[in-house]
Amino acid sequence: MPHIDNDVKLDFKDVLLRPKRSTLKSRSEVDLTRSFAFRNSKQMYTGIPIIAANMDTVGTFEMAKVLCKFSLFTAVHKHYSLEQWKEFASQNPDCLEHLAASSGTGSSDFEQLEQILNAIPQVKYVCLDVANGYSEHFVEFVKDVRKRFPEHTIMAGNVVTGEMVEELILSGADIIKVGIGPGSVCTTRKKTGVGYPQLSAVMECADAAHGLKGHIISDGGCSCPGDVAKAFGAGADFVMLGGMLAGHSESGGELIERNGRKYKLFYGMSSEMAMKKYAGGVAEYRASEGKTVEVPFKGDVEHTIRDIIGGIRSTCTYVGAAKQKELSRRTTFIRVTQQVKPIFSDES
């Protein structure tokens, strides 16, 4: 029977954070570092929990080199060869604790993952990524990976509801990726009509995960540092970024020059371009669920990282959180009809 859930569900654009009294004198006093103990792997994480998405135009080795300097994390895309992994690991051993090896559910993906983790034991994180994390096949795959790698920390997704977060955690995942359709180059909501507003998804999934001592990643939907802060305020343990990290020197994607301006290609991993590149084209039984865009070239990603980190520090001072850990406890969202005045920009 069709059913309508009449509860209001909200996105990042629908809210602002209410400022609160603070004893902080400076943004520099804010500690953005988090430490987590993972439920199933029993491993520890320490760092600033922002993750470059496992897209071949974002989650590159070049990106990982820069992000690890800031104690940020990279989910490296799955299309690097074993030899490329070995070369990177030998030249950048300090980065290995701040990255994950990614895999789909295919047998060739799993074989590649096994080879990487066996060859480079310092890599302790695995990112199991499918568009639809609700399939029984995916749940069984997570169980198999947990059985094969009992001491690796497993990220798995994507889902948007509490019951599936619980299912994946109980199946062996440590960190659940939350988000269906919010990404800037994702067209799943248009092609399928399926999705969930990201802010509400994060709040509900965080509640489910934390009850089991699990963790979540807010994956997608952030277009500015304020959105990243809102995701943390809503209870996300990690925030994964794609579009915000696209278009840089360290990003993948072809560099294009037109009329004296530089652009970089950025595309979803379910887009026609990605499927042509890695699968020989779009299979007859499926539709492309991503698009390709040209992002104005932004230069070195270091400047963007500083902007994001600076924004979150400022958020913490506005709400009186001396540590990022306190941000969700200090968060009160207010519903709004307008975020910014769009007089001098295209923002709305």
From Swiss-Prot:
It catalyses: IMP + NH4(+) + NADP(+) = GMP + NADPH + 2 H(+). It comes from the Eukaryota. Keywords: Acetylation, Metal-binding, NADP, Oxidoreductase, Potassium, Purine metabolism. The active site is at C186, T188. It is an enzyme of class 1 (oxidoreductase). GO terms for cellular component: GMP reductase complex. Its EC number is 1.7.1.7. The keyword Oxidoreductase applies. GMP binds at D219, G220, G221, G242, G243, G268, M269, S270, R286, A287, S288, E289, G290. K(+) binds at G181, G183, C186, R189. NCBIfam families: GMP_reduct_1, PRK05096.1. Homotetramer. This is GMP reductase 2. It comes from Bos taurus. The gene is GMPR2.
